[in-house]
Curated annotation (Swiss-Prot):
Xref: Gene3D superfamilies: 3.40.50.11320, 6.10.250.940, alpha/beta hydrolase
Record organism: Arabidopsis thaliana
Positions bearing carbohydrate: 156, 221, 271, 372, 383
Keywords: Carboxypeptidase, Disulfide bond, Glycoprotein, Hydrolase, Protease, Secreted, Signal
Protein name per its UniProtKB record: Serine carboxypeptidase-like 31
Amino acid sequence: MDNYQTKNISNLLTSLCFTTLLILAPVVICTRQHRFDSPKRSLLANEQDLVTGLPGQPDVSFRHYAGYVPVDESNGRAMFYWFFEAMDLPKEKPLVLWLNGGPGCSSVGYGATQEIGPFLVDTNGNGLNFNPYAWNKEANMLFLESPVGVGFSYSNTSSDYQKLGDDFTARDAYTFLCNWFEKFPEHKENTFYIAGESYAGKYVPELAEVVYDNNNNNKKNGSSFHINLKGILLGNPETSDAEDWRGWVDYAWSHAVISDETHRIITRTCNFSSDNTWSNDECNEAVAEVLKQYHEIDIYSIYTSVCIGDSARSSYFDSAQFKTNSRISSKRMPPRLMGGYDPCLDDYARVFYNRADVQKSLHASDGVNLKNWSICNMEIFNNWTGSNPSVLPIYEKLIAGGLRIWVYSGDTDGRVPVLATRYSLNALELPIKTAWRPWYHEKQVSGWLQEYEGLTFATFRGAGHAVPCFKPSSSLAFFSAFLSGVPPPPSR
């Protein structure tokens, strides 16, 4: 999900879209970063990051590591990761980097402990439960809190936080990978994938492009450094602002969240392909009406009861971003909506990760000088300084480069709904390889799937924004299919 607040609506929401220049993939040269104060940890000493004695952790046979990797020595910038080895054959199985969106939301708080990690946060943040559908059954899983300012990731230079945007985030994530592989050289040759959901629909292809370009440049320049990137996996992803907005509105109307009249006004007054759309007061008011209706339900899972009193939900709907704000950007930008699923588990995660014993065990702090961990950083969200309006050109580039791209969508998500994703993918005009069909898991229809030349798209029937929260078993099966490159079964 910039530093843009537009009249009325831009402060009522904040969101899917911005309209800045399409970033070119930056070329980043991997150089070894030396340690700096806090944390004082050698890049090669991964054993110092081995997690032992995590409070409430179930007994497991695999190893996991957590800690900081520096990405800018001079500015004192470091990123926090949590890495889970595959449950068996970790040296042979793929390595998958998982990113959550926001921008400003934690992949540790969401992906690792609410969705696909082996330890799910317990009720009231008292401990952890083993996840029988953890994705490290199939791969080594690396969770990164990105960019700095998210979760435990930090910078000692305050001006860094004013630069946060897509380009900055992709560069830092690539530098993180370079330095992380110095810590874990045994995984340098593993096949590598990047996965994520929501606003990571921007992060993932942008980072993949940086990796892809640097691999090619390193090869031309005779460098031996190479990240073995094979593909990307995207869940309910923000993709192309114009199509995402249109799909967001059409989904709300087709699922009876908004009235015919509201839909008609938006259709008539909102040109989501135009930079000037948000200067239209009638459009702003109609879009605000959509948000008003979504305020009453869970936008991330429209048929799920809301968590009354949930802090993340309250901060989203009731904070300053949802009220008028006197700051008007000189360049009108579209509003943004916070990404990430917000059930009561958000509060439990906040309690758990602010415990002194947990932070010490994860090497996030010394257990005395505690970090103030939050699942989403609203300052990052409100001050994002550059978002790619569409990553579809990156899709085209990666497809041409032979990388695997799979996209999935939970069909009860109102935040980045299935219609938005279908509109975005249709804009690519890819040839259809296999026609629309159901796909099955445990003899039941899990969703529908269509294969294009270079891309596979699937839906999850009855799943919300964070698909693995709703369909853990079928999402694990789908993940396994993605890694194999073979679509899930077309019959019972």
